Amino acid sequence: MKVRASVKKLCRNCKIIRREGIVRVICSAEPRHKQRQG
């Protein structure tokens, strides 16, 4: 899980979602693409 000021999609499988006020990126194809804004 990367914590970044600005989260971006890194591949076409990445999805940007918002959970409890935190913007996250989840990726089914590449778990290393997981990010959250912070």
From Swiss-Prot:
Task: Tell me the superkingdom of the source.
Answer: Bacteria
Q: GO cellular component annotations, sorted alphabetically? A: cytoplasm; ribonucleoprotein complex; ribosome
| Pfam family for this entry, one | Ribosomal_L36
Q: List the disulfide bonds.
A: none
- Species of provenance: Pseudomonas entomophila (strain L48)
SUPFAM superfamilies according to UniProt: Ribosomal protein L36 (SSF57840)
Question: Per its UniProt record, what PANTHER family does this chain match?
Answer: 50S RIBOSOMAL PROTEIN L36, CHLOROPLASTIC, LARGE RIBOSOMAL SUBUNIT PROTEIN BL36C
Name of the protein described by the UniProt record = Large ribosomal subunit protein bL36
Tell me, what is one Gene Ontology molecular-function annotation carried by this entry?
structural constituent of ribosome
* Keywords annotated in UniProt: Ribonucleoprotein, Ribosomal protein
One biological process term in Gene Ontology: translation
